[in-house]
Amino acid sequence: MNGILTPEVLVLGGTGAVGQGVVGALLEAGSPVLVVGRDPGRLAALHEQFADEPGLQTMLGSLSDDGSAKVLAERVAQRPRPLAAVVAAMGGPYNRGRVIDRSGDALLGAMQADLMPHAHAVRHLLPLLQDNPHARRYVMIGSPAGAKPWAGYGETSITTAALRMYAQVVHQEAQALGVRAQMLEVCSPVCTPANAANACIEWPSSLLVGRRAVSLLDGCRDNRAIVRCDNSDAELPRGLLNLDLPPLWRDTAGVA
């Protein structure tokens, strides 16, 4: 049955501000989308937002611990559509405050909340891609806080930097499985309905970020571990997403 159905893209964190842009861009490109989330209300709101899109499906699930991630992966593996790619747009709220004023337990909790869901997802979901004849892409969405410290948001800078290094390690290890794992690093804060009144002109919209993520899935030959996204990507083409067998690539580690 898998051979006659269009492959789908799994979006983690698809109910969040950035994740909604990823979902919108994938649907715009004609791809079936499966969004996993823990909150039934937010999943229902996402369905309402894209009510005219039959390609969107949702699934209740959690990546908060290893056992929950394993159960989720088993359910995804049983779906009739083959899995072509995973886009992880997960991230907690930015906690303002000085790191030197926080306890070690607080920093550990932030690491648990921001990094470990990605680790659980990679461990259990990335292997589902390795035997797939389709795109075999795994994309993590990163923020600019990982490349340089943000004043007043040091905790987020630390956890995001850890995720940035984690993505580079996964990039190397995933190639042995025939999967291309990359981080799409957004170079500025993302303009959302919540912050639009105070947003700077160079901040990309969540839909622009989503379109850039789609470009990494769509026959892209760029195999760098970290690819950057900024407002210069605004003119990306919006054709139908092609999730055919990926081309061979060289191991060219680095960042764009």
Predicted regions: what they are:
Residues F50-G67:
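Rossmann-fold cofactor-recognition segment
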Residues A176-T192, A196-A253:
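C-terminal helical subdomain
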Residues E74, Q78, A113-P133:
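Amphipathic alpha-helical dimer-interface segment in Rossmann-like NAD(P)H-dependent oxidoreductases
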Residues A110, Q130-L163, A167-Q168, Q172-Q175:
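Catalytic loop of short-chain dehydrogenase/reductase
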Residues I100-A119:
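Catalytic Tyr-X3-Lys loop
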Residues V87-R96:
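Conserved NAD(P)H cofactor-binding loop of Rossmann-fold oxidoreductase domains
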